[in-house]
Each structure stands twice: as structure tokens, then as C-alpha cells.
Amino acid sequence: MRGSDPDAAVFYLAKMLDAGEDVKFIARRIMICASEDVGNADPQALIVAVSAAQAVERIGMPESQIILAHAAIYVACAPKSNSVVEAIYAANRAVESSNGSVPVHLRDATTSRIAASADAHGYDGRPGDPDASIRGTQYKYAHNYPEHYVRQQYLPDDIKDAAFYLPGENGREKEIAAWLRHLKERDL
């Protein structure tokens, strides 16, 4: 599937089934490939794979081979991207090296200190923010801004400019990359 060869994918699926491989194991591998090797290039691939896994549990053999073939061929034919994998690995490395914590203006105001700060300093967001009374003074409610986006710091200070998710140019990720560029250009 990773190599975008639907013929090889369905052939090796048939070989695994012929050898007695558990259909649930095969379905799990298809789900993993859909996320790991396709990712946001075609988000529908994971939905197809999960649906196939659920159907296999209900249907059984011999019909499950058709369901697995459907999913394996879909995933094999989908545009590929490992940007999601790279993003979580980069974020994991940052967690190991970062001392930072969630910026105060993003924290849940369940502590009296944060709630008192919000009350003492007022809220600088726009009217109608349902979170205005429970957040710090710098929080801005994205849905009250054009395109439901507002620039504010979301990462800890020591990694505030980090970029973990770098969408590729295949499939849906090309659109995601363009959207993220558009938002960043608005910030200039």
C-alpha cells in the first residue's frame, strides 16, 4: 500500500488470507498505513480503513476479503504523505527538551489565581466570547475573528516559533498548506 501499487496490495492481501492471517490483524495494518503513510494527503483513507475494520468484525469470512481488498486498494491508490508522522515525532522531541508550559492566557481558569487575574485585568477579546470570564486577559476567542482565526501564542515561550506539522504537496495536504500560508500572510 505504501508504494502506491494496488495490484501488489491486493495480491499480498490474498497471500496473507491464504496463509491464514487473522483478518483483524490485516485490518489493523490497513488502518495504520492509512494514517502513517497517507495521513492528511487523503483523510478519507483512515475513515475507509476504520469502516473496513468494523465491517470485518461483523461480517467474517469469506466476505471480509472483499472488504479488506476495498480498503487496501483505496489506501494503495491514495496520495501519500508522512507529514503527520513527522509532526508527532518532532513534537515528542520538543516535549522532551522543552521546559515550557501552556501560556497563562490559554489555561483553564479553574484556579482562583487565573480567575482573579481575569477579573482584575478585564478581558481584551471581543464581545460575545463565552470564555471571556474564565480566561486570562490575553486570550482571544478565534471564532470572533474573520475566518475564525486570530494570531496569538499557543506554544510555550521556549518553543513559541516551532513548526511541527509541515504539510506536503500531495492530495489534500496541498490545500492545507495553502490555507496555513494564507493565515500566516494575514499576520504580516
Predicted regions located by residue number:
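Terminal-proximal interaction/regulatory segments of ATP-powered molecular machines
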Residues: 2-147, 155-188
